[in-house]
Amino acid sequence: SKGKKANKDVELARG
């Protein structure tokens, strides 16, 4: 759950 949220945050910041 935490990893998934962090992954989404990272992807959003990268995008």
Curated annotation (Swiss-Prot):
Coiled-coil blocks: none
Main location: secreted
Keywords from the UniProt entry: Antibiotic, Antimicrobial, Secreted
Cell cycle keyword on record: no
Transmembrane portions of the chain: none
Location of this chain's protein in the cell: Secreted
GO CC field: extracellular region
Tissue: Skin.
Annotated GO biological process: defense response to bacterium
Role of this protein: Has antibacterial activity against Gram-positive bacterium P.citreus.
Name of this protein: Oncorhyncin-1
